[in-house]
From Swiss-Prot:
Stretches that traverse the bilayer: 27-37, 55-66, 70-78, 96-107, 112-120, 146-155, 160-167, 186-194
Organism: Salmonella typhi
Annotated site, Part of salt bridge gating mechanism, chain positions: E73, R163
Entry protein name: Outer membrane protein A
Entries under InterPro entries matching the protein: Bact_OuterMem_StrucFunc, OMP/PagP_b-brl, OMP_bac, OmpA, OmpA-like, OMPA-like_CS, OmpA-like_sf, OmpA-like_TM_dom
Pfam families: OmpA (PF00691), OmpA_membrane (PF01389)
Membrane topology annotation: Multi-pass membrane protein
Length: 350
């Protein structure tokens, strides 16, 4: 009884500290153990010689980890063959069994746990006896006994763990059947492999798409290419020039931007006349670009009259009308300002 109490105390000592190196939740593990098996209370009926109580023990086990604190194990234990010798009787006793236990653990550090196992073992015990005169008898017995164990477990890697454990099993056998009813203490070192411990690859959020780039471009077209002198109707050559311009505007995606068409005249004529002519010419360009596909709410016309001449005073001394008209040709122009959105395309990383 005293030895049983000590074994239980060792098993429950695992809960006096803090810790965990248990496998991940809801995963399986399997392992093996090897150690020192010692039988207790081994008095054989009619035995008159020494009994070799210390033997080699071994086992294999598998388990399921529910969470960091609770798991279940099933295992096979070979508790060793214990010979005894005497003047009148000699023989051997051996025991083995299958156990099922609940494993209760508590983490001390990230890599180290203490634990206890509580459950039962279905065992088989066999004896062989030789008596004077050469007679030999063999007997066996089966039964169920409680199992108590306590130990520490250290995770070498997430998959590989080692354990040091002391296990106690009560009353393995029936003295009336096989001549003895020993207890067993097994001090063992074990190693286990844990399945499903690999960390899932981190999900890398895709980089946000770069903000669309707003571009502003200016185009200047000579009015003499677009219109006849003093007229606001587009010439065929002017339509061709606007067709080429439209292909460039499309690349800027004016649907997401705006287009402003500015009409300019030279200084020949009155201010009012030139203002009206510049407005008509700008509107003619707008109407044509709308017909090509630019939304009407994204484009506007503005007449600038004879303001902002580009010739400056270079034509001040030119007197003949025809020569003056030629000299002032750069002032007769249509300027187009486009603000458009262009998507920024990033190349994927290799």
């Amino acid at each position: 009884m005293k030895k049983t109490a000590i074994a239980i105390a060792v098993a429950l000592a695992g809960f006096a500290t803090v810790a965990q190196a248990a496998p991940k939740d809801n995963t399986w593990y399997a392992g093996a153990k090897l150690g020192w098996s010692q039988y207790h209370d081994t008095g054989f009926i009619h035995n008159d010689g020494p009994t070799h109580e210390n033997q080699l023990g071994a086992g294999a086990f598998g388990g399921y980890q529910v969470n960091p604190y609770v798991g279940f194990e099933m295992g096979y234990d070979w508790l060793g063959r214990m010979p005894y010798k005497g003047d009148n009787t000699n023989g051997a006793y051996k025991a083995q069994g299958v156990q099922l236990t609940a494993k209760l653990g508590y983490p001390i550090t990230d890599d180290l746990d203490v634990y206890t196992r509580l459950g039962g073992m279905v065992w088989r015990a066999d004896t062989k006896s030789n008596v004077p005169g050469g007679a030999s008898t063999k007997d066996h017995d089966t039964g169920v006994s409680p199992v108590f164990a306590g130990g520490i477990e250290y995770a070498i890697t997430p998959e590989i763990a080692t354990r040091l454990e002391y296990q106690w099993t009560n009353n393995i056998g029936d003295a009336n059947t096989i001549g003895t009813r020993p207890d067993n203490g097994l001090l063992s070192v074990g190693v286990s492999y844990r399945f499903g411990q690999q960390e899932a690859a981190p999900v890398v959020a895709p980089a946000p798409a770069p903000a669309p780039e707003v571009q502003t471009k200016h185009f200047t077209l000579k009015s003499d290419v677009l219109f006849n002198f003093n007229k606001s109707t587009l010439k065929p050559e002017g339509q061709q020039a606007l067709d080429q311009l439209y292909s460039q505007l499309s690349n800027l995606d004016p649907k997401d931007g705006s287009v402003v068409v500015l009409g300019f005249t030279d200084r020949i004529g009155s201010d009012a006349y030139n203002q009206g002519l510049s407005e008509k010419r700008a509107q003619s360009v707008v109407d044509y670009l709308i017909s090509k596909g630019i939304p009407s709410d994204k484009i506007s016309a503005r007449g600038m009259g004879e303001s902002n001449p580009v010739t400056g005073n270079t034509c001040d001394n030119v007197k003949p009308r025809a020569a003056l008209i030629d000299c002032l040709a750069p002032d007769r122009r249509v300027e187009i300002e486009v603000k458009g959105v262009k998507d920024v395309v990033t190349q994927p990383q290799a």
